[in-house]
Amino acid sequence: MNRFFRIALLVLMSAIGMSVMAQESAQIPVDPKVRIGKLSNGLTYYIRHNDYPKGQAEFYIAQKVGSIMEEDNQRGLAHFLEHMCFNGTKSFPGNNLVQWCESVGIKFGYNLNAYTSIERTVYNISGVPTARESVQDSCLLILHDWANDLLLDEKEIDAERSVIHEEWRSQMSPQQRVMEKLLPIMYPNSRYGYRLPIGIMDVVDNFPYQALRDYYE
C-alpha cells in the first residue's frame, strides 16, 4: 500500500508540475475586442460581442472566494453557498429562479450552472436569447442577487444538506480517497492540503444557519 501511495504521489506531482509550467509559459494576451472596466464597488467587468452562437448571450460572475478561505469549522460552506444560489434570492424566491430560466429556454444544469474551486466560485448563465432585452436584464438581476441577496431560508438549507451529502458520496471514488491522503503530504502546514471544496460532512450536516449567513456576508 505504501508503494502504491508513493507511485500515486509521484504521478500527481508530475501532473501538477506540468500544469504549472504550461500556465507559466503560456501568457494569453488580452483580446482587444473585450471592453474592460471597473465599477465603484470594485467589480471588474468584461464585455465582448460574439456572433456565435447567433442570437444568444452568456453571463458569468466569478468571485474570488473558494474553500481556501474557510476556517476548520467552515469546511464546505463556500460550496454550500454555491448550491444555495439556486434556492431562493430576493428577486426570485423559492424555486422561481430556476423556473423563470427554464421558461425562457435556459436549462438548469446545462445553461444555468456554477462551480466552486479552492480559490474561486464561478456562476454562469448561457444560451440566453437576445431577442428580448428584458430577458438579458433579468439575467443581470440574477447575477446581482447571487452576489448580494441570497435568502438562505432555513428549510432550504436543511434540504440542501442531504443533496450535498449525496454529491460527496458519489465523489468518493478510490482516486478521490487517494487525493485526500496525498494533498496534506504535498502541501504540509498549508490549507491547500485540507480544503477540497466539498468540505467535510460533519460541518455540512451540523453548521448553524447563522454560520452560513455570516460566511456569505
Task: For each feature predicted by the language model, list its residue ranges.
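Acidic/histidine-enriched alpha-helical segments
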Residues: 94, 98-102, 150-169, 180
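M16/insulysin-pitrilysin zinc metalloprotease superfamily fold
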Residues: 91, 125-160
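Mature N-terminal segment immediately following signal peptide/propeptide cleavage
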Residues: 24-61
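M16/MPP (pitrilysin/insulinase) zinc-metallopeptidase core fold and M16-derived inactive scaffolds
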Residues: 58-126, 173-174, 178, 194-200, ...
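Bacterial N-terminal signal peptides
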Residues: 7-19
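Positively charged n-region of N-terminal signal peptides that target proteins for export
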Residues: 1-7
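Histidine-acidic residue clusters that define the catalytic metal-binding segment
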Residues: 23-35, 123-126, 133, 141, ...
